[in-house]
Protein backbone atom coordinates (compact mmCIF):
# COMPACT_ATOMS: atom_id res chain seq x y z
CA UNK A 1 0.00 0.00 0.00
CA UNK A 2 1.48 3.35 -1.05
CA UNK A 3 2.47 5.91 1.58
CA UNK A 4 -0.05 8.42 0.23
CA UNK A 5 -2.86 5.95 0.98
CA UNK A 6 -1.62 4.91 4.42
CA UNK A 7 -1.30 8.59 5.36
CA UNK A 8 -5.01 9.08 4.65
CA UNK A 9 -5.84 6.04 6.79
CA UNK A 10 -3.60 7.33 9.58
CA UNK A 11 -5.26 10.75 9.44
CA UNK A 12 -8.74 9.27 9.86
CA UNK A 13 -7.65 7.06 12.76
CA UNK A 14 -5.44 9.54 14.60
CA UNK A 15 -7.29 12.78 13.98
CA UNK A 16 -10.97 11.87 13.62
CA UNK A 17 -11.46 8.93 15.98
CA UNK A 18 -11.89 10.09 19.63
CA UNK A 19 -8.61 9.47 21.55
CA UNK A 20 -10.28 7.33 24.23
CA UNK A 21 -11.41 4.93 21.51
CA UNK A 22 -8.40 5.30 19.22
CA UNK A 23 -5.91 4.29 21.92
CA UNK A 24 -7.90 1.41 23.36
CA UNK A 25 -6.59 -2.13 23.02
CA UNK A 26 -9.89 -3.58 21.81
CA UNK A 27 -10.22 -1.00 19.03
CA UNK A 28 -6.65 -1.45 17.75
CA UNK A 29 -6.43 -5.24 18.08
CA UNK A 30 -8.00 -6.07 14.67
CA UNK A 31 -5.74 -3.52 12.96
CA UNK A 32 -2.67 -5.20 14.47
CA UNK A 33 -3.94 -8.61 13.34
CA UNK A 34 -4.30 -7.32 9.78
CA UNK A 35 -0.96 -5.49 9.85
CA UNK A 36 1.12 -8.39 11.20
CA UNK A 37 -0.79 -11.29 9.67
CA UNK A 38 -1.23 -13.19 12.93
CA UNK A 39 -3.52 -13.34 15.94
CA UNK A 40 -0.45 -13.45 18.22
CA UNK A 41 0.02 -9.67 18.22
CA UNK A 42 0.80 -9.10 21.90
CA UNK A 43 4.58 -8.56 21.33
CA UNK A 44 3.80 -5.93 18.72
CA UNK A 45 1.07 -4.18 20.71
CA UNK A 46 3.35 -4.00 23.77
CA UNK A 47 6.47 -2.97 21.85
CA UNK A 48 6.61 0.51 23.40
CA UNK A 49 6.64 -0.84 26.96
CA UNK A 50 9.40 -3.35 26.12
CA UNK A 51 11.62 -1.45 23.70
CA UNK A 52 13.71 0.59 26.13
CA UNK A 53 14.74 -2.52 28.06
CA UNK A 54 15.94 -4.22 24.87
CA UNK A 55 19.59 -4.88 24.17
CA UNK A 56 20.93 -4.13 20.70
CA UNK A 57 20.61 -7.84 19.91
CA UNK A 58 17.00 -7.91 21.16
CA UNK A 59 16.22 -4.92 18.96
CA UNK A 60 17.75 -6.56 15.87
CA UNK A 61 15.93 -9.82 16.56
CA UNK A 62 12.61 -8.02 16.95
CA UNK A 63 12.92 -6.35 13.55
CA UNK A 64 14.11 -9.59 11.97
CA UNK A 65 10.95 -11.27 13.31
CA UNK A 66 8.56 -8.87 11.56
CA UNK A 67 8.50 -11.12 8.51
CA UNK A 68 5.57 -10.37 6.23
CA UNK A 69 4.09 -7.50 8.22
CA UNK A 70 2.41 -4.67 6.35
CA UNK A 71 5.41 -2.39 6.93
CA UNK A 72 7.68 -4.99 5.30
CA UNK A 73 5.35 -5.51 2.36
CA UNK A 74 5.45 -1.84 1.39
CA UNK A 75 7.97 -0.93 -1.26
CA UNK A 76 8.79 2.21 0.72
CA UNK A 77 7.49 4.42 3.53
CA UNK A 78 8.45 7.47 1.49
CA UNK A 79 5.87 9.54 -0.36
CA UNK A 80 6.68 11.16 -3.69
CA UNK A 81 6.65 14.66 -2.22
CA UNK A 82 9.46 13.75 0.19
CA UNK A 83 11.52 12.15 -2.57
CA UNK A 84 11.13 15.36 -4.60
CA UNK A 85 12.31 17.41 -1.62
CA UNK A 86 15.51 15.36 -1.47
CA UNK A 87 16.17 15.52 -5.22
CA UNK A 88 15.50 19.27 -5.28
CA UNK A 89 17.99 19.89 -2.48
CA UNK A 90 20.57 17.58 -4.03
CA UNK A 91 20.83 19.93 -7.00
CA UNK A 92 22.46 22.44 -4.65
CA UNK A 93 24.79 19.89 -3.02
CA UNK A 94 28.06 18.58 -4.39
CA UNK A 95 29.60 15.22 -3.58
CA UNK A 96 29.84 11.74 -5.04
CA UNK A 97 29.26 9.41 -2.07
CA UNK A 98 25.83 8.60 -0.64
CA UNK A 99 24.78 6.53 2.37
CA UNK A 100 21.17 5.59 3.13
CA UNK A 101 20.66 4.79 6.83
CA UNK A 102 17.78 2.36 7.37
CA UNK A 103 17.92 1.41 3.73
CA UNK A 104 15.48 -1.51 3.81
CA UNK A 105 15.22 -2.87 0.26
CA UNK A 106 17.28 -0.03 -1.20
CA UNK A 107 14.31 1.85 -2.66
CA UNK A 108 15.67 5.35 -2.03
CA UNK A 109 19.14 4.45 -3.31
CA UNK A 110 17.52 3.20 -6.51
CA UNK A 111 15.59 6.46 -6.85
CA UNK A 112 18.67 8.62 -6.25
CA UNK A 113 21.16 6.55 -8.23
CA UNK A 114 20.33 8.40 -11.44
CA UNK A 115 20.62 11.89 -9.95
CA UNK A 116 24.36 12.05 -10.63
CA UNK A 117 27.41 9.87 -11.29
CA UNK A 118 27.87 8.60 -7.74
CA UNK A 119 31.30 7.21 -6.96
CA UNK A 120 29.92 5.28 -4.00
CA UNK A 121 26.38 4.16 -3.08
CA UNK A 122 25.93 2.46 0.28
CA UNK A 123 23.15 1.40 2.62
CA UNK A 124 23.06 0.31 6.25
CA UNK A 125 20.28 -1.37 8.24
CA UNK A 126 19.77 -3.50 11.34
CA UNK A 127 18.86 -6.51 9.21
CA UNK A 128 20.18 -7.63 5.86
CA UNK A 129 18.61 -6.30 2.67
CA UNK A 130 16.03 -8.58 1.09
CA UNK A 131 15.08 -8.75 -2.55
CA UNK A 132 17.21 -8.20 -5.62
CA UNK A 133 18.78 -4.82 -4.87
CA UNK A 134 22.50 -5.39 -5.46
CA UNK A 135 23.45 -2.07 -7.00
CA UNK A 136 24.97 -0.73 -3.77
CA UNK A 137 27.24 -1.87 -0.96
CA UNK A 138 25.39 -3.02 2.15
CA UNK A 139 26.46 -2.83 5.81
CA UNK A 140 24.76 -4.20 8.90
CA UNK A 141 24.62 -1.67 11.72
CA UNK A 142 22.30 0.36 13.87
CA UNK A 143 22.12 3.81 15.32
CA UNK A 144 23.59 5.35 17.38
CA UNK A 145 26.78 3.46 16.48
CA UNK A 146 27.46 3.10 12.76
CA UNK A 147 30.56 1.41 11.27
CA UNK A 148 31.83 4.46 9.39
CA UNK A 149 34.56 7.08 9.77
CA UNK A 150 33.95 10.75 10.54
CA UNK A 151 32.56 12.60 7.49
CA UNK A 152 32.88 9.46 5.37
CA UNK A 153 29.92 10.29 3.11
CA UNK A 154 29.16 13.50 1.24
CA UNK A 155 25.42 12.87 1.49
CA UNK A 156 23.54 10.85 4.12
CA UNK A 157 19.82 10.07 4.01
CA UNK A 158 17.80 8.76 6.94
CA UNK A 159 14.12 8.42 6.09
CA UNK A 160 11.41 6.97 8.32
CA UNK A 161 13.98 5.85 10.88
CA UNK A 162 13.96 8.52 13.61
CA UNK A 163 10.49 7.46 14.76
CA UNK A 164 11.90 4.00 15.55
CA UNK A 165 15.02 5.02 17.49
CA UNK A 166 15.75 4.22 21.12
CA UNK A 167 18.04 7.27 21.53
CA UNK A 168 17.20 10.09 19.14
CA UNK A 169 19.73 12.64 20.41
CA UNK A 170 22.70 10.26 20.22
CA UNK A 171 21.55 9.03 16.82
CA UNK A 172 21.33 12.55 15.39
CA UNK A 173 24.88 13.22 16.57
CA UNK A 174 26.01 10.01 14.90
CA UNK A 175 24.35 10.92 11.60
CA UNK A 176 26.05 14.31 11.66
CA UNK A 177 29.38 12.69 12.53
CA UNK A 178 29.47 10.65 9.33
CA UNK A 179 28.05 13.42 7.09
CA UNK A 180 30.36 15.71 5.16
CA UNK A 181 28.03 17.94 3.13
CA UNK A 182 24.30 17.20 3.47
CA UNK A 183 22.07 15.15 5.75
CA UNK A 184 18.44 14.43 4.89
CA UNK A 185 15.90 13.26 7.47
CA UNK A 186 12.29 12.38 6.73
CA UNK A 187 9.81 11.37 9.43
CA UNK A 188 6.03 11.36 9.84
CA UNK A 189 4.08 14.17 11.44
CA UNK A 190 2.17 12.05 13.92
CA UNK A 191 0.68 12.48 17.37
CA UNK A 192 1.48 10.05 20.17
CA UNK A 193 -0.64 6.99 20.82
CA UNK A 194 0.47 3.90 22.72
CA UNK A 195 -1.05 1.55 20.15
CA UNK A 196 0.45 2.47 16.81
CA UNK A 197 1.44 0.35 13.85
CA UNK A 198 4.92 0.32 12.30
CA UNK A 199 6.77 0.06 15.64
CA UNK A 200 7.02 3.80 16.25
CA UNK A 201 8.58 5.04 19.50
CA UNK A 202 8.98 8.76 18.78
CA UNK A 203 6.30 11.17 17.61
CA UNK A 204 6.58 14.64 16.10
CA UNK A 205 3.24 16.38 15.59
CA UNK A 206 5.43 19.50 15.80
CA UNK A 207 8.95 19.68 14.43
CA UNK A 208 10.52 22.00 17.04
CA UNK A 209 11.71 19.26 19.47
CA UNK A 210 13.77 17.73 16.69
CA UNK A 211 15.04 21.07 15.40
CA UNK A 212 16.53 21.78 18.83
CA UNK A 213 18.74 18.72 18.41
CA UNK A 214 19.99 20.04 15.07
CA UNK A 215 21.49 23.28 16.39
CA UNK A 216 23.80 24.98 15.42
CA UNK A 217 23.60 23.44 11.96
CA UNK A 218 21.88 25.04 8.98
CA UNK A 219 18.43 23.48 8.60
CA UNK A 220 15.69 23.70 6.02
CA UNK A 221 12.44 21.85 6.66
CA UNK A 222 9.09 21.49 4.94
CA UNK A 223 5.92 19.51 5.50
CA UNK A 224 5.60 17.23 2.49
CA UNK A 225 2.51 15.05 2.20
CA UNK A 226 2.14 14.47 5.93
CA UNK A 227 5.87 13.97 6.53
CA UNK A 228 8.53 16.31 7.82
CA UNK A 229 11.32 16.59 5.23
CA UNK A 230 14.53 18.12 6.59
CA UNK A 231 17.81 19.08 4.93
CA UNK A 232 20.76 19.72 7.26
CA UNK A 233 24.07 21.27 6.26
CA UNK A 234 26.63 20.56 9.01
CA UNK A 235 28.07 23.63 10.71
CA UNK A 236 31.59 22.68 9.62
CA UNK A 237 30.39 22.84 6.00
CA UNK A 238 28.63 26.22 6.33
CA UNK A 239 31.75 27.64 7.96
CA UNK A 240 34.04 26.44 5.16
CA UNK A 241 35.34 29.11 2.78
Feature names for model-found ranges:
Residues 157-166:
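A short SAM/SAH-binding and catalytic strip from SAM-dependent methyltransferases
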Residues 96, 154, 181:
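Conserved acidic residues
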Residues 1-149, 159, 172, 196-241:
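Conserved N-terminal segment of class I S-adenosyl-L-methionine
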Residues 181-189:
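Conserved beta-strand signature within the Rossmann-like core of class I S-adenosyl-L-methionine
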Residues 166, 179-180, 215:
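Short conserved AdoMet
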Residues 165-174:
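A short, conserved alpha-helix within the catalytic core of class I
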Residues 192-194:
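Short, solvent-exposed loop/turn segments at secondary-structure junctions
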Residues 118-119, 179-181:
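A short helix->loop->beta-strand "cap" motif at the edges of active sites that frequently abuts
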Amino acid sequence: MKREITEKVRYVMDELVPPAIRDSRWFMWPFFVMAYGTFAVRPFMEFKSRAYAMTAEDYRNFYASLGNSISRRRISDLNEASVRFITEQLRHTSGTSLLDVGTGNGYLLSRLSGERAWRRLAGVDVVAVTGESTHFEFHEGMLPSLPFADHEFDVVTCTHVVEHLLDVEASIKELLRITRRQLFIVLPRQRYYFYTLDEHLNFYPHIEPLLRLLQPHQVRHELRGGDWAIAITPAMQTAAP
